[in-house]
């Protein structure tokens, strides 16, 4: 039986195509082998990606040994930490769409038979998965792996969150320049995705839970022999399943796989960005999946692992040592029906077979169900008159005293205004900070709010101030921070109608985000209201703002106008 790449290499009419392929070094024998795409994301400026060029070389060698013909291509990548707190963050979420489009373009333009994806950080992982789902060929993911936690001289573990929060302490005069410099130099000690349960590691963990990656993908450290061995196995597996209809990506990433991903997300208190990305991934997979389904999963899954930033002493390397994703899945599967164990993985095993025999090796890192941090998941979906279409909060990172909090609104119409206000002392205990016009359309690009949230924590206001935004948060954010408020202010959402001094309430147990203003008053405020429009000079961001949906739909690009 033929394979997809026969379209470009078989028959007399493809002589010109073969001629071009021979120019790249192919021989007669290669035209009888499967053509394997390698979507690499080597980018020098990203700590999790600067070494991926070597990983691509290793993967190509392994594919050749396994009987395939590798064709490597690259995607762009944005480092959210470096783009944070300035106009660069406008491009982070839109880059997900460019990455997805580039995967679809390269794979379909050249009729490749299978795909090996080598992502690592932030938007690159979901962007690759979205594009691969459109192509729907057998696909294996192997990320670059997480970095080690940093260590202070006394052995205290630190990470990127420590550095961001230290800025707030320095602004208050609670930390010297020398102390800040020591943290700066030690927070990110190696290559890899940042060491906590931030967005990159969350998405790599979820790829493992969905079965598109091999066991260990989410937790084995970067730049180690273990990670290299994992990459070699993934490359070989891409050749083994090339052309095998059973392993087409949409047969792996189905409703059961997406459910299992959210189970692990809830059990480990992943980044709130995972909600945005899983909604988009489900759409590309053709799976009906929304915020209500996510909340239903959260209600059934205990939160059994707290990882930085929720618990600063525990990092991804500790989760790996404690048994990794298989141990987490095995533990939550003890509550019957929670894990869909019949779901197929790229190795040919079911999830149930993959986790059989897994065990928790350190119960201080992964708790048994009986000692869960909470009986429900580490993420929650909120609704209410301030978020009729939903909002998301990382409950794993909220202090107990802030799970129900009412504060007086102090409103900012951009992240930059908010940072200036916080640094300038405008935000006081008892305030509920509202940052609006930062949604997918209004930003545009739905900036991450790590800078303002870190300033709030670093200034010691974490148990006295809450924050709500139509933007989103870094996985490194902690505190009573509600994001993805939908509809966003730029499309006339209620967030745009809030005024300074209004009483705003977050109630995690009630799953509610509300403003204590009568409906009649909100209606009066809406009369004559026009959302603010920011001047957008970039042609790409203009197109993005015109076509993007709001966060409740995954901030995907609309294809029907």
Curated annotation (Swiss-Prot):
<dbReference type="Pfam" id="PF24877">
    <property type="entry name" value="ILV_EDD_C"/>
</dbReference>
<dbReference type="InterPro" id="IPR004404">
    <property type="entry name" value="DihydroxyA_deHydtase"/>
</dbReference>
<keyword id="KW-0408">Iron</keyword>
<keyword id="KW-0028">Amino-acid biosynthesis</keyword>
<dbReference type="GO" id="GO:0009097">
    <property type="term" value="P:isoleucine biosynthetic process"/>
</dbReference>
<dbReference type="InterPro" id="IPR037237">
    <property type="entry name" value="IlvD/EDD_N"/>
</dbReference>
<comment type="function">
    <text>Functions in the biosynthesis of branched-chain amino acids. Catalyzes the dehydration of (2R,3R)-2,3-dihydroxy-3-methylpentanoate (2,3-dihydroxy-3-methylvalerate) into 2-oxo-3-methylpentanoate (2-oxo-3-methylvalerate) and of (2R)-2,3-dihydroxy-3-methylbutanoate (2,3-dihydroxyisovalerate) into 2-oxo-3-methylbutanoate (2-oxoisovalerate), the penultimate precursor to L-isoleucine and L-valine, respectively.</text>
</comment>
<dbReference type="InterPro" id="IPR042096">
    <property type="entry name" value="Dihydro-acid_dehy_C"/>
</dbReference>
<keyword id="KW-0100">Branched-chain amino acid biosynthesis</keyword>
<dbReference type="GO" id="GO:0005829">
    <property type="term" value="C:cytosol"/>
</dbReference>
<comment type="similarity">
    <text>Belongs to the IlvD/Edd family.</text>
</comment>
<keyword id="KW-0001">2Fe-2S</keyword>
<feature type="modified residue" description="N6-carboxylysine">
    <location>
        <position position="123"/>
    </location>
</feature>
<dbReference type="GO" id="GO:0004160">
    <property type="term" value="F:dihydroxy-acid dehydratase activity"/>
</dbReference>
<feature type="binding site" description="via carbamate group">
    <location>
        <position position="123"/>
    </location>
    <ligand>
        <name>Mg(2+)</name>
    </ligand>
</feature>
<comment type="pathway">
    <text>Amino-acid biosynthesis; L-valine biosynthesis; L-valine from pyruvate: step 3/4.</text>
</comment>
<dbReference type="InterPro" id="IPR056740">
    <property type="entry name" value="ILV_EDD_C"/>
</dbReference>
<dbReference type="InterPro" id="IPR000581">
    <property type="entry name" value="ILV_EDD_N"/>
</dbReference>
<feature type="binding site">
    <location>
        <position position="122"/>
    </location>
    <ligand>
        <name>Mg(2+)</name>
    </ligand>
</feature>
<feature type="binding site">
    <location>
        <position position="80"/>
    </location>
    <ligand>
        <name>Mg(2+)</name>
    </ligand>
</feature>
<dbReference type="Pfam" id="PF00920">
    <property type="entry name" value="ILVD_EDD_N"/>
</dbReference>
<feature type="binding site">
    <location>
        <position position="194"/>
    </location>
    <ligand>
        <name>[2Fe-2S] cluster</name>
    </ligand>
</feature>
<dbReference type="GO" id="GO:0009099">
    <property type="term" value="P:L-valine biosynthetic process"/>
</dbReference>
<protein>
    <recommendedName>
        <fullName>Dihydroxy-acid dehydratase</fullName>
        <ecNumber>4.2.1.9</ecNumber>
    </recommendedName>
</protein>
<feature type="binding site">
    <location>
        <position position="121"/>
    </location>
    <ligand>
        <name>[2Fe-2S] cluster</name>
    </ligand>
</feature>
<dbReference type="InterPro" id="IPR020558">
    <property type="entry name" value="DiOHA_6PGluconate_deHydtase_CS"/>
</dbReference>
<feature type="binding site">
    <location>
        <position position="448"/>
    </location>
    <ligand>
        <name>Mg(2+)</name>
    </ligand>
</feature>
<dbReference type="GO" id="GO:0000287">
    <property type="term" value="F:magnesium ion binding"/>
</dbReference>
<comment type="pathway">
    <text>Amino-acid biosynthesis; L-isoleucine biosynthesis; L-isoleucine from 2-oxobutanoate: step 3/4.</text>
</comment>
<comment type="subunit">
    <text>Homodimer.</text>
</comment>
<dbReference type="GO" id="GO:0051537">
    <property type="term" value="F:2 iron, 2 sulfur cluster binding"/>
</dbReference>
<keyword id="KW-0411">Iron-sulfur</keyword>
<feature type="active site" description="Proton acceptor">
    <location>
        <position position="474"/>
    </location>
</feature>
<keyword id="KW-0456">Lyase</keyword>
<keyword id="KW-0460">Magnesium</keyword>
<keyword id="KW-0479">Metal-binding</keyword>
């Amino acid at each position: 039986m033929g394979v997809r790449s026969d379209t470009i290499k078989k028959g007399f009419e493809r002589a010109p195509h073969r001629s071009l392929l021979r120019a790249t070094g192919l021989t007669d024998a290669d035209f009888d082998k499967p053509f394997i795409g390698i979507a690499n994301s080597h980018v020098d400026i990203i700590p999790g990606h600067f070494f991926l060029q070597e990983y691509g070389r290793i993967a190509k060698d392994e594919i050749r040994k396994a009987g395939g013909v590798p064709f490597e291509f690259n995607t762009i990548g944005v480092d959210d930490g470096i783009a944070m707190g300035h106009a660069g963050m406008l491009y982070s979420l839109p880059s997900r769409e460019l990455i997805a489009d580039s995967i679809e373009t390269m794979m379909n333009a050249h009729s490749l038979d299978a795909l090996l994806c080598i992502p690592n950080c932030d938007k690159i992982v979901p962007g690759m998965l979205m594009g691969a789902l459109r192509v729907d060929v057998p696909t294996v993911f192997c990320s670059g792996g997480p970095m080690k936690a940093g260590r202070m001289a006394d052995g205290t573990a630190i990470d990127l969150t420590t550095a961001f929060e230290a800025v707030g302490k320095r602004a208050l005069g609670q930390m010297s320049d020398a102390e800040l410099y020591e943290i700066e130099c030690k927070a990110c000690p190696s290559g890899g995705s940042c060491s906590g349960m931030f967005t990159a590691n969350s998405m790599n963990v979820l790829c493992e839970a969905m079965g598109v990656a091999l066991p260990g993908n989410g937790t084995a450290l970067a730049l180690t022999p273990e990670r290299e061995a994992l990459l070699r196995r993934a490359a070989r597996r891409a050749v083994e399943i090339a052309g095998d209809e059973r392993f087409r990506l949409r047969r792996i990433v189905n409703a059961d796989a997406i459910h299992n991903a959210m189970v692990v997300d809830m059990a480990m208190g992943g980044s709130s960005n995972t909600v945005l990305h899983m909604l988009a991934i489900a759409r590309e997979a053709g799976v009906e999946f929304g915020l209500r389904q996510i909340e239903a999963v959260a209600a059934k899954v205990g939160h059994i692992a707290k990882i930085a930033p929720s618990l600063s002493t525990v990092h991804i390397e500790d989760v790996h040592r404690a048994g990794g994703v298989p141990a987490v899945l095995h533990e939550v599967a003890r509550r019957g029906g929670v894990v869909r164990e019949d779901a197929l993985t790229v190795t040919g095993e079911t999830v149930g077979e993959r986790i059989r025999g897994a065990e928790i090796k350190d119960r201080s890192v992964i708790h048994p169900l009986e000692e869960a941090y909470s009986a429900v998941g580490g993420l929650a979906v909120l609704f209410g008159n301030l978020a009729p279409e939903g909002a998301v909060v990382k409950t794993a990172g909220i202090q107990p005293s802030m799970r129900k909090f009412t504060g007086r609104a102090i409103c900012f119409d951009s992240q930059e205004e908010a940072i200036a206000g916080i640094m300038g002392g405008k935000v006081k205990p008892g305030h509920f900070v509202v940052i609006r016009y930062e949604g997918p359309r209004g930003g545009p690009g739905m900036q991450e709010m790590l800078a303002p949230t870190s300033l709030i924590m670093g200034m010691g206001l974490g148990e006295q101030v809450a924050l709500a935004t139509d933007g989103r948060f870094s996985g490194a954010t902690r505190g009573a921070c509600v994001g993805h408020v939908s509809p966003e202010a730029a499309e006339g959402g209620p967030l745009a109608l809030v005024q300074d001094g209004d009483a705003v309430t977050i109630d995690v147990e009630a799953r509610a985000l509300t403003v204590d203003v009568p409906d009649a008053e909100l209606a009066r405020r809406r009369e004559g209201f026009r959302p603010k429009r920011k001047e957008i000079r970039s042609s790409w961001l203009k197109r993005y703002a015109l076509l993007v949906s709001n966060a409740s739909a995954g901030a995907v690009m609309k294809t029907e106008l």
